[in-house]
Amino acid sequence: MKKIVLVAGGTGGHFFPAVALGEELIKRKYEVHFITDLRCEKYINHDAGLIFHVIDLKRPKNILLFLPLLSLAIFKAIKLLFSLSPSAVVGFGGYPVVASMFAAIFLRVPIVIHEQNSYLGKVNRFFANFAKKIAISYKNTKNLPVVVKNRTVVTGGIVRKNIRGLDSVVKRRNDKDRTFKIFIFGGSQGAKLFSELIPESIKALMQKQPNLKLHITQQAALDDQVKIKNIYSNLNINYELAEFFDNMANQYKNTDLVISRAGASTIEELTYIGLPAIFIPLPSAADNHQYHNAKLLEDEKCGWCMKQDDISSEKLAEKIFELISNPKILENTSKNLLKRRKEGHKLLSNLIEELI
């Protein structure tokens, strides 16, 4: 049985797409090993059938301290890959993959990289020069070296299995008496900005349109929840608050509009099920990739991008009301999203099989 090694870590945005790819490769009778870091150890599910290994490497803060840590991590990765003798190594970007990718190059194992964002990150840009194939999620991905374009294939993003099980078409009902459901989330602990901005936006909206029927589901840190509860209770609207939502699929299927950051995994999941969103990109994201992701979708009429530096509760309230008042806009946006949908887990698996 041939072995494939997947390397992803740092955040769930890298980790979960790699797991979805691994599940598809296991179905195709490959032995799949998964190298991750300590931050993603909490996501490991041995029931998925993947064989996990942890080699930790964080983003460098001090280059003098980083080099010895990188050398140690590369040594561990070489030792592991030599023992496995894989047919290919697939990296998903970010600093946690660096050691394993260097090890694969040293051992002359074919490497493939997958870029989830619309802007090729620093790590993927470097390893693109050594990769047999570069899989991208967007045909207009920026920051691609010219010399690798003939090795680049659009496979689309990769979506978790439980999200792929949802109905692909989000149906819109032109019913003014219907409760409009908004789902708000912003990272593993909820974005502080969202806890302050969005309740004030809903308050401004309800003051101008008191007859609106809303249901708000919002991710928020525990410290922020009392204040948010008071605002929503005083507005007499239905709401649900949580620090973290385990079952995103269940939330998506009961939602009309999402307000979120613009990470690659979020965008791919919403694209797959045709669920429109207002994106507020995280300004501190590496290479400003969240802005590039959201702006590309906005340009293709697949969502709305509102920059954090420019947004206000009044502007957000106006945008929400515009969308509630015009269900046709949401319907068209949903259709545009579905046109972008790809079965990334299958297309990337095909690419790997062609390579080995």
From Swiss-Prot:
Top EC class per UniProt? transferase
Per the entry, what this protein does is: Cell wall formation. Catalyzes the transfer of a GlcNAc subunit on undecaprenyl-pyrophosphoryl-MurNAc-pentapeptide (lipid intermediate I) to form undecaprenyl-pyrophosphoryl-MurNAc-(pentapeptide)GlcNAc (lipid intermediate II).
Q: One short Pfam family name for this protein?
A: Glyco_transf_28
Its gene is murG
HAMAP family for this protein: MurG
Q: Name its cellular compartments.
A: Cell inner membrane
**What does the record list as GO biological process?**
carbohydrate metabolic process; cell division; cell wall organization; lipid glycosylation; peptidoglycan biosynthetic process; regulation of cell shape
Q: Which GO terms describe its molecular function?
A: UDP-N-acetyl-D-glucosamine:N-acetylmuramoyl-L-alanyl-D-glutamyl-meso-2,6-diaminopimelyl-D-alanyl-D-alanine-diphosphoundecaprenol 4-beta-N-acetylglucosaminlytransferase activity; undecaprenyldiphospho-muramoylpentapeptide beta-N-acetylglucosaminyltransferase activity
One GO term of the cellular component aspect? Answer: plasma membrane
Family designation: Belongs to the glycosyltransferase 28 family. MurG subfamily.
Q: Which organism is it from?
A: Rickettsia bellii (strain OSU 85-389)
What Enzyme Commission number does this protein have?
2.4.1.227
What protein is this chain from? UDP-N-acetylglucosamine--N-acetylmuramyl-(pentapeptide) pyrophosphoryl-undecaprenol N-acetylglucosamine transferase
**Annotated catalysed reactions:** di-trans,octa-cis-undecaprenyl diphospho-N-acetyl-alpha-D-muramoyl-L-alanyl-D-glutamyl-meso-2,6-diaminopimeloyl-D-alanyl-D-alanine + UDP-N-acetyl-alpha-D-glucosamine = di-trans,octa-cis-undecaprenyl diphospho-[N-acetyl-alpha-D-glucosaminyl-(1->4)]-N-acetyl-alpha-D-muramoyl-L-alanyl-D-glutamyl-meso-2,6-diaminopimeloyl-D-alanyl-D-alanine + UDP + H(+)
| Lineage per the UniProt record | Bacteria, Pseudomonadati, Pseudomonadota, Alphaproteobacteria, Rickettsiales
